Amino acid sequence: SEELSFSFTKFKTDQKNLILQRDALITPTGKLQLTTVENGKPAAYSLGRALYSTPIHIWDKSTGDEASFATFFSFVISDAPNPSTAATDGLAFFLAPADTQPQSAGGYLGLFEKDSSYNSSNQIVAVEFDTYYNSAWDPQTNPHIGIDVNTIKSKKVSSWGFKNGNVATVLITYQPSSKSLVASLVYPSGQTSDKTSYIISANVDLKATVPEWVRIGFSATTGQTDNYIETHDILSWSFKSKLPATKN
């Protein structure tokens, strides 16, 4: 079988095997900062993405087999300290063609081009952690976790009790036998008595959606003015995929 795995417990400023796009950078403290922060304040109209440099063999044309995968990461989103700001827009984990480039900012999360955001030829699967209600395509549950298949309008959505500034841990798995993509988010700190875990799943046919080889990574965006901003920091990330051996 073909296996690939990696683990970043933190990130190095000269991190090999990561492709940083647009505003993404690694901070001196080892965080993968996807969107710009200036003087401690998130910047408006920021878009940043980070991809694992090695493409992943996610399905095999000769056998028709798909890979199973699991990815685990932790992140923090912090709204600006000013109470008049709204947390905007969110971050996503995604799989896309190997030559994937940043797309439209704002509510499109850097994943979709404004004019083709409903086009099934996008070849992208994403799990979004969306803090802002875009009335044109989002359900009214805000903030929410969504599973996106080729379009910014999520195939499946679950409400999410976003906790400003708290570390969230996420596990995303894909099982080819059931074509089941499952994402869970937990706030492990137990600082509040509120609900702290969320789960969402959807049937996704990876073979019908993305190319045989994909790149995986994160994308995040902020809003268009200083009233619609937040930070997007990935603290750790691990991934493992397994594709069954080629049939002779």
From Swiss-Prot:
It comes from the Eukaryota. The keyword Calcium applies. Glycans are attached at residue 119. InterPro entries: ConA-like_dom_sf (IPR013320), L-lectin (IPR016363), Lectin_LegA_CS (IPR000985), Lectin_legB_Mn/Ca_BS (IPR019825), Legume_lectin_dom (IPR001220), Leguminous_Lectin (IPR050258). One of its GO terms (molecular function) is metal ion binding. Ca(2+) binds at residues 130, 132, 134, 138. Keywords: Calcium, Glycoprotein, Lectin, Manganese, Metal-binding. CDD domains: lectin_legume_LecRK_Arcelin_ConA. Mn(2+) binds at residues 128, 130, 138, 144. It holds the Pfam family Lectin_legB. Gene3D superfamilies: 2.60.120.200. PROSITE patterns: LECTIN_LEGUME_ALPHA (PS00308), LECTIN_LEGUME_BETA (PS00307). Belongs to the leguminous lectin family. This is 2-acetamido-2-deoxy-D-galactose-binding seed lectin 2. It comes from Cytisus scoparius.
